[in-house]
């Protein structure tokens, strides 16, 4: 079983974990191409491209200008990313065995790096997968990453010993690998969905759903889950599997108030 999630916009590079290895991202060469292209933008143009404030645009410009492939200013991405999903994962509660299992069974999709193993070292950056970066003959980042990212994820699924992909990424990021089950028909994609009962109906509450995705990552990694039936046993923070709302492709977990 392989799990995919989205990265976070929020980063914390103050913490250093020297006990864990730091590895090179698989698509470091491809990331370098993107960085070199983005260095051509001034902060104003970068802000328009990424729809960010002047302050954040200047920060991103500076980040791209000093980006490099050494580990001098890198952190393991699982440690560096923050936000609701990563709050739910709570990597600080993992033991060493959990961390190494996570490195084998989790991939973080990335606009800049394509796909990251948890121990992969990253520089501070922000580049969302949906950014409409057009250069050379590429229409956008989806076009840039194309089949090479899809085949990498298929390879990583196979490396876990089965054919299951658990999609805990947002659609913006999952879209970059959408269709891998058509390239390899043995791949089985399951998407957990988290809903809360409000005003007489079950609704997706965005912030809670994001944290729930992280909670499920934690549940899978700590319990070494490797099949759908055990996945359905997820029960953290009151969520329970709702068979009536689920189907073969979507596992719905609901929270009652």
UniProtKB/Swiss-Prot annotation:
GO BP annotations listed: response to hydroperoxide
A GO CC annotation given for this chain: cytosol
InterPro entries (alphabetical): YaaA (IPR005583)
NCBIfam families registered for this protein in UniProt: PRK02101.1-3
Family as reported in the entry's similarity comment: Belongs to the UPF0246 family.
Protein name, as recorded: UPF0246 protein CLH_2088
Organism: Clostridium botulinum (strain Alaska E43 / Type E3)
